[in-house]
């Protein structure tokens, strides 16, 4: 009686805001409290699927999730015969298992869902195809089709194959399915003309993620959208800083899961875009257009 507490604001499984009273001083293993876990998507004790091993952020994501207590991390790998820089680093992580997955191939997605669908508690869709360019600078629609195949249709294939099983496992206790994470570009909210076609594919993915969130709402599985600015990779090299390191992206994602957030903006550019988008989408559009003209 009379002890001071701190109030935290969280979302319940229906997406409604609730207040929870916690001790002023953090208790040992506080994050393991069942009531608190019901209000978060904490990766501790849970099994995670990362969809694209070839994305430069895959190793950082897997490492951060394991450090946060994930019991297993499955990492999807397309065309395993084709080498990529971080394969050895991924294989060296205890708790990581590389699995065959190509998000552009419906059969590949369905086969993995049939084998692992009942084991995935958190799905992180980091599959991405990005190339610079808009409309007139490209001679055909080849890259645009690749961007849509991975960034939009890839998410749809994954959702059609994995979402039903995850929705059916949202009340399985410690190992319940809790979160579906979409890694989106901040340019899903406003087009960057220098990456106009990529922006368009992410805008489509953003809209699809909102549809998925609505469909999953009754199950209690949270759809989390991570909006990120330009990252430190080969395709964003021509852009000026600031850029988001993979380690920062991974850290912010884990924090978002632990806090049970629905939307998180990573990096100064993403946060600036969000602020300006909330103030005036048209002014933000004009600003992006003027930057392209410089």
Roles of regions detected by a PLM:
Residues 31-74:
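Canonical Rossmann dinucleotide-binding motif of NAD(H)/NADP(H)-dependent dehydrogenases/reductases
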Residues 207, 211-269:
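SDR active-site lid
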């Amino acid at each position: 009686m009379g002890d001071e507490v701190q109030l935290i604001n969280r979302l319940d499984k229906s997406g409604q805001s609730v207040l929870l009273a916690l001790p002023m001083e953090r208790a040992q293993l506080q994050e393991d409290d069942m009531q608190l876990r019901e209000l978060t998507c904490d990766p501790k004790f849970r099994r995670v699927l990362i969809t694209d091993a070839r994305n430069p952020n895959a190793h950082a994501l897997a490492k951060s999730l394991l450090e946060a207590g994930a019991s297993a991390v499955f990492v999807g790998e397309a065309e395993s015969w084709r080498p990529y820089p971080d394969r050895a680093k991924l294989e060296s992580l205890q708790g990581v298992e590389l699995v065959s997955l190509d998000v552009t191939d419906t059969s590949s997605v369905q086969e993995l869902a049939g084998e692992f669908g009942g084991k995935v508690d958190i799905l992180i869709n980091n599959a991405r195809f990005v190339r610079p360019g808009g409309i007139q600078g490209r001679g055909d629609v080849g890259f645009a089709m690749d961007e849509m195949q991975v960034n939009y249709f890839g998410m749809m294939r994954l959702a059609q194959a994995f979402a039903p099983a995850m929705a059916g496992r949202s009340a399985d206790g410690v190992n319940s399915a809790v979160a579906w994470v979409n890694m989106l570009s901040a340019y899903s909210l406003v087009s960057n003309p220098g990456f106009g076609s990529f922006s368009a594919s992410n805008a489509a993915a953003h809209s699809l993620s909102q549809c998925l969130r609505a469909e999953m709402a009754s199950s209690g599985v949270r759809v989390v959208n991570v909006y990120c600015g330009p990252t430190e990779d080969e395709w964003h090299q021509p852009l000026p800083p600031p850029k988001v390191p993979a380690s920062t992206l991974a850290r912010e994602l884990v924090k978002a899961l632990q806090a049970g957030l629905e939307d998180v903006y990573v990096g100064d550019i993403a946060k600036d875009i969000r602020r300006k988008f909330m103030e005036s989408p048209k002014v933000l559009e004009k600003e992006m257009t003027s930057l392209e003209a410089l």
